[in-house]
Regions:
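Predominantly extracytoplasmic/ectodomain segments of secreted and cell-surface proteins
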Residues: 1-28, 32-33, 100-101
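Short glycine/proline/serine/threonine-rich loop/turn segments at secondary-structure transition edges
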Residues: 24, 72-77
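Low-complexity "stalk/linker" and mucin-like segments enriched in Ser/Thr/Pro/Ala/Gly
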Residues: 38-61
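Extracellular/luminal low-complexity segments enriched in Ser/Thr/Pro
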Residues: 65-73
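A short beta-strand micro-motif common to beta-rich folds, especially ectodomain repeats
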Residues: 75-86
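C-terminal edge beta-strand
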Residues: 89-100
Length: 102
């Protein structure tokens, strides 16, 4: 779980750089994404950026970054990110953000 203060506006990321198929030309990339947040936490914005895989290679459009604000202290929120890739694959990953006074 990732901590967040109720007053903080912070960015969190989902990195698919190791999961995307880089054996093709051009490399598979994220072409669409949806970030879903439960009531009480606010999604301020989200975007797709380049990410880095474990080999240290930059992979174009392989990471989703989302900015969150708000939340109720003592509450844990499950935030979901669904992507669609240029190869037509879909994947969903979750983050758990725990809001606490810091």
């Amino acid at each position: 779980m990732i901590p967040k203060d109720p007053e903080a506006v912070l960015d969190y990321a989902w990195n698919w750089a190791n999961w995307l198929d880089t054996s093709t030309t051009p490399n598979e990339s994220i072409i669409a994404h949806t970030v879903t947040v439960p009531s009480g936490l606010t999604l301020d914005s989200s975007t797709v950026i380049d990410g880095v895989n474990t080999a240290g290679t930059t992979i174009t459009n392989s990471q989703v970054v989302a900015w969150f604000s708000g939340g109720i202290a003592g509450t844990t929120y499950r935030v979901e990110c669904l992507i669609t890739t240029s190869a037509g694959r879909k994947d969903e990953r979750s983050l758990w953000i725990t809001v606490q006074e810091r």
